[in-house]
Every structure is written in C-alpha cells, then in structure tokens.
A protein has these predicted regions:
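Carbohydrate-active catalytic/glycan-binding domains of CAZyme proteins
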Residues: 1-257
Length: 257
C-alpha cells in the first residue's frame, strides 16, 4: 500500500510501496518484521498501473539500472548484512528506546567499550521508559548476540536480551538469582494476565566456576520459531530452549502494523 511512482531517466517506471514478509505457512499471515518499504518494477496498461509485472508476489530482489551508492561509513539497512557495535563512541542512531528517556540511565563513558545500563524498577511489561535499548528485527532468519557483565544480588535484579513486540508479547533471556542461586532464565510474557506479566519457560543453574565470567546470550530467529542460547566463552554454546513459538510476537497475534 501507499505507493509512489518514479520514472528513471531511461523511461522505466518503479514503485515504492509498503508490504510484509510472512513466514511459512504464508496463509497464516504471521510476520515479525513489521511493514517494510519495497522498490518494485511497474509499467502501465493505458492509465492503469501494473505493479510487479510477470510475478504474483513481490520478489526478494530485482536488477536495477543503477550503480550502488555506498558512502564512506555506510551501515547496511536492508538485505543480508552483519552489524556489530563495540560501543566505543556515541550511541548509533540504529538503536531505539521504549519511549523517550526523561534522564540518562545509560553510559558509554563509564567503561570504555561497554554500554552500561542502570538497574531500575521500570520493566518492559509496563508502559514506561525502562532500561531498554534495542534494534528492530529486520530478517526472518537471523541471530542477535550480546556479551554481558552482570552480577545480580537478588531475584528482582535481571539483565539480558529481550525480543519484544509489545508489553504483553515478548521473550526475555536473562541472568538473575533464583532460590539464592545464579541462573540463566527464559521468560515469556503472560499476554495480559497477572503473574507479574511474565512466566518462566526454562532456566540453567550457573556453576560456581562460571558465576564471575562474562555471559554471552543469543536469540536466533528461524522463520516461525526462536532459539535461545548462552555461552561463557563465545565458543561452546548451550541451547536453553529451542523451537519457541515466534508467531506469539507476530503482528497477526500481538497486533500492531
């Protein structure tokens, strides 16, 4: 929808429009990447525009009569790409918050090469501004990994990696305390129910020789499922839980655009 038409210097026509990429089975209309911007070929049948001629569905790529424009320092925003942030400078514009912070609760100068976040009582289950910095999921098949230093003191202190659609639809992979022991936990939001708006799906009790180590957390998206893993050396990975329902975060289930 919302199509604009563009004619190039050689007389060819293209359209810029919005669309979505559902995971299989396509008829279920489950997609976790939101509405996206597409550039598709078009032509005219009299005064009637014909989008994507020759195809029923929009294709993943087309040949364009243009040379790629890649300025110095360009960070890819579409297609297949890898992005890594060492947090050595100011916060990149690709990172987003949940609502506008009223004060600074993060720092890139407290420890060089680290993004330091303050522990605060606000959570992602509430319509507030929690200690949350994220990027949008841009791929159906992808993974996101963080390296983290965190030493919780009680069960209310948690930090980790979250995949979030809204306050009632998210999965949270974190390090915390449970029954007095250090653990890696996976939570699922409770879809508007009580139980503090999330419940535990699985956990791993951290061994004594692992407690003071950095922890690596990873979420892999594989179409309509997610996989949640952890490591203490970024080499040997353990799956905490696999084949987790990703459609729970889809627009069809959780709402939104």
């Amino acid at each position: 929808g919302h199509a604009d038409y563009v004619q190039t210097n050689d007389g060819k026509w293209y359209s810029v429009l919005l669309g979505s990429r559902p995971s299989e089975p396509f008829e279920k209309k489950h997609f976790n990447t939101g509405r996206e911007t597409y550039l598709v070929p078009m032509n005219w049948d009299g005064d009637w525009p014909i989008m994507n001629p020759g195809f029923k569905e929009v294709q993943y790529s087309y040949s364009l009569p243009l040379k790629p424009y890649i300025p110095k320092g360009y960070i890819p925003q579409s297609g297949n790409f890898t992005y890594k942030d060492e947090f050595n400078n100011k916060l990149n514009n690709n990172w987003i918050f949940l609502r506008t912070p009223k004060f600074s609760w993060y720092s890139l100068s407290q420890k060089k090469g680290f993004l330091s976040l303050k522990l605060r009582p606000e959570t992602c289950s509430e319509k507030v501004n929690p200690s949350f910095i994220a990027r949008r999921q841009q791929h159906i098949f992808s993974n996101a990994t963080i390296k983290m230093k965190f030493y919780p003191r009680n069960h209310n202190e948690k930090a980790g990696l979250i995949i979030f659609q809204n306050e009632d639809h998210f999965y949270y992979l974190c390090k915390s305390i449970m029954d007095g022991k250090n653990v890696i936990q996976l939570y699922k939001s409770s879809n508007g129910n009580d139980q503090s708006k999330m419940h535990i799906l699985d956990f791993y009790e951290i061994k004594k020789n692992e407690i003071n180590k950095d922890v690596f957390l990873k979420i892999e998206s594989k179409g309509n499922i997610y996989s949640f893993s952890f490591s203490f050396d970024n080499k040997k990975w353990s799956i905490l839980k696999d084949s987790v329902d990703a459609t729970f975060l889809s627009t069809e289930t959780a709402g939104g655009f």
